[in-house]
Amino acid sequence: KLTDMYGKIKEHLQHELAEIEAAGLYKRERIIASPQRAEIEVAGRKVLNFCANNYLGLSDNPRLIEAAKKAMDARGYGMSSVRFICGCQDIHKELEKAIADYFGTEDTILYAACFDANGGVFEPLFSEEDAIISDSLNHASIIDGVRLCKAVRYRYANADMGELEECLKKAQAQRFRIIVTDGVFSMDGNAAPLDRICALAEKYDALVMVDECHSAGVLGETGRGITELYDLRGQVDILTGTLGKAFGGAVGGFTTGRREIIDMLRQRSRPYLFSNSLPPAVVGAGIETFKMLAESHELHDRLVANVEHFRAGMMAAGFDIKPTQSAICAVMLYDAKLSQEFAAKLQDEGVFVTGFYYPVVPKGQARIRVQVSAGHTIEQLDRCIAAFTKVGKELNVIK
């Protein structure tokens, strides 16, 4: 029997859902009937995939699949426990060391997702005596993590070093100060000016934390992220990241950095303490991922070449492209309805992308976000550019 209270909330939710639908903001899941790769099957037809975070093309890599199978055969399907009770195998420690070696840090702690890593990093380390200074375009997980903490909060406009400096001046009375930024911002694809952030952190005596989710595997000479890009390896106090993007695309997050910080997170970070350990298959494939990346940076080099090829082709066609160094290419359309229509027509042309508009991006800043992968061939990139060009002319976006 339904309670009266459920009847009330049901009516309320139905009304809110109808409003979301009417505003064109209702999110529908698009069903993929193939492995995640450069070409996927959607609604019974093959399309080129340009909206996955599969930056190094590893989501269906045979070596990772085999490593996952071997780990599951040797260590089982699941852990059925949190780490500090009976959920820690030798391979969990091996993966944590591999991540620390990759980023040049002292220690690493694994989480179920990077949302948990960001959500669980602030509360154990900072109190009302401290200050967190956060970029305005940081990921939702950072925003939620900061909300869970009692520290004084400051926010500066995206990559605005003048505003950041003003925040640091205001925060001088606090005991501890930390600057928090995404390495690459997911909607524009721009990289944080980490060299200038670290210079200000040194000037005003602050810690620095970077979310490497969209920069690890992508930026830097060998793909080791934004700290490598700016020659700051080992100089950033806290890095967070994911195994769900460049590093195989499955699940799992991590925090890596100073040893004492990681040790305190093991003691008091609630998402770590109260969530099951990562399953052996994911851990085994993760270890294999970092072995592959230690052997060669061929995949990173291919990604860089693909990004350069795609951006050059799109700009030659006349599209308005946000300047970035990342694998995220924001094709600016500015109008919300146009971005939806453009994305739908591209899917008709066999190109799978997503249009983004308010409230995901600011009003008047609608765009199609293209994510390039090392798994794309030059022929696939050219097909995508040709489809964009055809639709762009049909909709009077380009001449």
Protein language model regions, located:
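Short loop-beta-helix segment that forms the pyridoxal 5′-phosphate
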Residues: 82-88, 97-120
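Active-site C-terminal subdomain of aminotransferase-like
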Residues: 204-207, 214, 219-325, 338
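Conserved PLP-anchoring active-site segment centered on the Schiff-base-forming lysine
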Residues: 121-140
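PLP-dependent enzyme catalytic core of the Aspartate aminotransferase-like
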Residues: 2, 7, 62, 66-70, ...
